[in-house]
């Protein structure tokens, strides 16, 4: 496999806050270096359920993850597995749920916090965190610049074809402060500023890039149900592919087949949605 793509998931950012507060991403849209669409989360619009949908291309009603309290090793084929089957190298820097869904369950703190498994059928290079002890006051999230740097390190050291990064910072802060607040305005600005220097590095290394969220949040910092604030987020794409008209709404089940299409890998038979990129 000679194609490369990175998926960056900023957990819990509603569409309006992406478009209003991420000045670097929006600047690249204005310059023509990126394109942006609205992205609609599955139902329930709960984090774990959305993680599973993003990578399997099927709804929670099919893959079976009904919420954060129901995490298990998924049976459906996923982006990691399909990339590996086509000869690609995979990596993930993310919450431990991702390792449990797509590699091993339950998560072993010592064995699974960091691994390099060249023969794995799913995730070759994993760097995970659990957020154990998470609460309203202490959100237990790593520094995002450290996560971006870790993904870059994996790309350079191991030649990833597909890498994904997931950070819970903005979701956790949104639950505490709600998204219509000075604290969240600043947090989104800081996230945008920390992410921005890595975008040119990844592009220079030959990666296409998708930046999005798993779901949004409403005025009270809630998500899990139906509605524009809970379900709708933005999706930014950096790369040469042609995409749909700007007013198109991307369904979450389209992400997995789109990523695999851009990598030149075969989508699983269970991934029925069409790629939104040519």
Spell out what each predicted region is.
Residues 1-278:
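Feature captures the catalytic ectodomains and active-site-proximal regions of enzymes
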